[in-house]
């Protein structure tokens, strides 16, 4: 039986939240002790690496900020959208690492900003539209590749974990369907 998509995406998201990210200290801060975990001390301007969930809390507290390359923003989304549009159906480009978890968080942040400042609503709506375009473009490519003969690892290496899971499920389903349709059996067998 196929593994539910929500379990796969949840698993990828769990791994992302616990993956190491880089951040820069905004100010000096002594060592912080949590249950079984010590973080810091932090010196203003220095770069540190912590699990994403800790970095997120440090950012909320104003102690640190994410490095620019750790973030996904509207400008990066537009570049990705452009890249997806100019490529052929048989080729899928490499997305930034942890693209979908970062995308979900980017959209959540924009939505929260829009709820507090109505002038941000337009940016949120544009980002949402661009995101939908990226997802639809990649989905078309995944479906096309999944219905073609098996792909080489070279082709599949640009898939994200979420996309590879979808590709494998679709490929298996399409292959089984084709086999059933094209199977030559006598009536009544």
Report residues per predicted region.
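Compact, well-ordered interaction domains used in eukaryotic information-processing assemblies
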Residues: 29-72
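Short N-terminal secondary-structure initiator segments
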Residues: 17-19, 44-45, 51, 88-92
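N-terminal, Lys/Arg-enriched amphipathic/low-complexity engagement segments
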Residues: 1-31, 35
């Amino acid at each position: 039986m196929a593994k539910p998509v929500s379990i796969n995406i949840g698993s990828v998201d769990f791994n992302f939240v616990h993956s190491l990210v880089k951040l820069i200290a905004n100010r000096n801060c002594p060592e912080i002790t949590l249950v079984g975990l010590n973080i810091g001390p932090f010196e203003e301007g220095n770069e540190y690496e912590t699990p994403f969930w800790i970095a997120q809390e440090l950012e909320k507290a104003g102690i640190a900020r994410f490095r620019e390359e750790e973030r996904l923003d509207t400008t990066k989304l537009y570049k990705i959208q452009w890249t997806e549009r100019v490529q052929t159906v048989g080729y899928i480009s490499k997305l930034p690492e942890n693209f979908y978890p970062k995308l979900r968080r980017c959209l959540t942040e924009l939505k929260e900003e829009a709820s507090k400042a109505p002038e941000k609503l337009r940016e949120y709506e544009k980002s949402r539209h661009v995101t939908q375009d990226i997802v639809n473009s990649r989905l078309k490519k995944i479906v096309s590749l999944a219905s073609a003969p098996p792909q080489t690892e070279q082709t599949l290496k640009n898939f994200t974990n979420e996309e590879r899971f979808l590709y494998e499920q679709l490929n298996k389903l399409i292959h089984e369907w084709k086999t059933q349709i094209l199977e030559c059996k006598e009536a009544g067998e």
